[in-house]
């Protein structure tokens, strides 16, 4: 009888399926619980299927190019051709991911990263941010000027990917379908067209370091950022399906394009262009990969950003539209800020024109609009919270130059509360 009891005690079972240890290959013990190899395999399949299903849902509901452009139109004024080109490029990128995941075809679609080329304040960063928000994918912005070749003072290129992983809440699968915008990419051009004998750690060296992650590789990313060292653990991330958008002003490239195009228009019967015809925006539309090589990008780098989207400098009309038309227009933002203090804010059309003119004078594009408004209203925004008698502020043309907006007092000496409109919940993703 004692022998039988001992045998019963030794007969261990899986706590999930009930199979005994001699019915399975392996039985793993935990604190008061057992699990067999078959149950482990089943759990692994269920979890991996759920992950694949989640990613597939995100990737199969790709908006059409028209839908992408319509969304961009709500936030980005002008740049019609650029928005079309960008919408098509982004649609094809995520379509390629689905094709390579699902198709048994031998044809594998190759990755196409994007180069946004245009003057400061033309909307390059805004386009990339708006795209990521609409597609509901993780998004990261990196500054190319802070990057250096591995082993030198500065940031390694892998730190770009760390920002993306952090913005995806360390969900690697989600980060692998995100968008990375690398700004100031023109600042890492090598100093001359010919390869340098001396080491260019912040120019050509960075371009070389970026090649692998742009093309698609499994990168090792330090989880805390900083430099790599052999005794730390790394986060592994596959960059094959990450869309890289590089942006830069490329000051001076118009001269390179002009020299190239001028050669083809020499001789008898050639059309003589006036200075007015030599518009920088029109010149940029004629850009060729060879022009980027002459500017200082290496051939391998140019080959990994095959889609070139050019943006034009914003004119006076576009800047005025930017001030008042987009969903998050600056005029709407400042009106909302003043409403929170129960003060009405009014911008006269002449004031918007003066603000646009000042931005053109400073050559800062749309980026300088907020700074000009802040300068105009700095003193008013300082005083308003303390002055209960002020009910309305009017910004006219003179206020832009004198920094003294017109103030209107309340009839009874004290302003009445303004009922704020409840913001409607917008369909679609708000954050990336």
Curated annotation (Swiss-Prot):
Residues 2-55 form the ClpX-type ZB domain. It comes from Clostridium kluyveri (strain NBRC 12016). Gene3D superfamilies: 1.10.8.60, ClpX chaperone, C4-type zinc finger domain, P-loop containing nucleotide triphosphate hydrolases. This is ATP-dependent Clp protease ATP-binding subunit ClpX. ATP binds at residues 119-126. Component of the ClpX-ClpP complex. Forms a hexameric ring that, in the presence of ATP, binds to fourteen ClpP subunits assembled into a disk-like structure with a central cavity, resembling the structure of eukaryotic proteasomes. Zn(2+) binds at residues 14, 17, 36, 39. Keywords: ATP-binding, Chaperone, Metal-binding, Nucleotide-binding, Zinc. Residues 416-426 have a biased composition (Basic residues). Residues 411-432 are annotated as: Disordered. GO terms for cellular component: HslUV protease complex. The gene is clpX. PROSITE patterns: CLPX_ZB. GO terms for biological process: cell division; proteolysis involved in protein catabolic process. SUPFAM superfamilies: Glucocorticoid receptor-like (DNA-binding domain), P-loop containing nucleoside triphosphate hydrolases. One of its GO terms (molecular function) is zinc ion binding. PANTHER family: ATP-DEPENDENT CLP PROTEASE ATP-BINDING SUBUNIT CLPX-LIKE, MITOCHONDRIAL, ATP-DEPENDENT CLP PROTEASE ATP-BINDING SUBUNIT CLPX-LIKE, MITOCHONDRIAL-RELATED. InterPro entries: AAA+_ATPase, ATP-dep_Clp_protease_ClpX, ATPase_AAA_core, Clp_ATPase_C, Clp_protease_ATP-bd_su_ClpX, ClpX_bact, P-loop_NTPase, Znf_CppX_C4. Belongs to the ClpX chaperone family. ATP-dependent specificity component of the Clp protease. It directs the protease to specific substrates. Can perform chaperone functions in the absence of ClpP.
């Amino acid at each position: 009888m004692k022998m039988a009891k001992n045998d019963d005690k030794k007969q261990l079972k899986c706590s999930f399926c009930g199979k005994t240890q001699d019915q399975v290959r392996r039985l793993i013990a935990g604190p008061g619980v057992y699990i067999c190899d078959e149950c482990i395999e089943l759990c692994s399949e269920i979890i991996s299927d759920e992950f694949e299903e989640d990613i597939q849902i995100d990737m199969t509901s790709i908006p059409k190019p028209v839908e992408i452009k319509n969304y961009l139109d709500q936030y980005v004024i002008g740049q019609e051709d650029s928005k079309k080109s960008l919408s098509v490029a982004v649609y094809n990128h995520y379509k390629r991911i689905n094709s390579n995941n699902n198709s048994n075809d031998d044809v594998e679609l190759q990755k196409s990263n994007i180069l946004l080329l245009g003057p400061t304040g033309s909307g390059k960063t805004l386009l990339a941010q708006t795209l990521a928000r609409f597609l509901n994918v993780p998004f990261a912005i990196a500054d190319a000027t802070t990057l250096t070749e591995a082993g030198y003072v500065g940031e390694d290129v892998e730190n770009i990917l760390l920002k993306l992983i952090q913005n995806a809440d360390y969900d690697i699968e989600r980060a692998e379908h995100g968008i990375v915008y690398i700004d100031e990419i023109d600042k890492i051009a090598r100093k001359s067209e010919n390869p340098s004998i001396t080491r260019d750690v912040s120019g050509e060296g960075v371009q070389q370091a970026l090649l692998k992650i742009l093309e698609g590789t499994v990168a090792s990313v330090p989880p805390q950022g900083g430099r790599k060292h052999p005794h730390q653990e790394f986060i592994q991330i596959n960059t094959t399906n990450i869309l890289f958008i590089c942006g830069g002003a490329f000051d001076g490239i118009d001269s390179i394009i002009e020299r190239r195009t001028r050669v083809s228009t020499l001789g008898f019967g050639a059309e003589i262009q006036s200075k007015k015809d030599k518009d920088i925006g029109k010149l940029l539309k004629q850009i060729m990969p060879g022009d980027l090589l002459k500017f200082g990008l290496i051939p391998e780098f140019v080959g990994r950003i095959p889609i070139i989207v050019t943006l034009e400098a914003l004119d006076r009309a576009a800047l005025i539209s930017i001030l008042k038309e987009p969903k998050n227009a600056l005029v709407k933002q400042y009106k909302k800020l003043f409403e929170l203090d129960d003060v009405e804010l009014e911008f006269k059309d002449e004031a918007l024109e003066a603000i646009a003119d000042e931005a053109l004078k400073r050559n800062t594009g749309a980026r300088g609009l907020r700074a000009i408004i802040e300068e105009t209203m700095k003193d008013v925004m300082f005083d308003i919270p303390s002055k209960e008698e002020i009910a309305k502020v009017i910004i006219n043309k003179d206020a832009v130059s004198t920094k003294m907006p017109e103030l209107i007092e309340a009839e009874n000496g004290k302003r009445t509360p303004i009922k704020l409109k409840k913001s409607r919940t917008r369909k679609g993703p708000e954050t990336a």
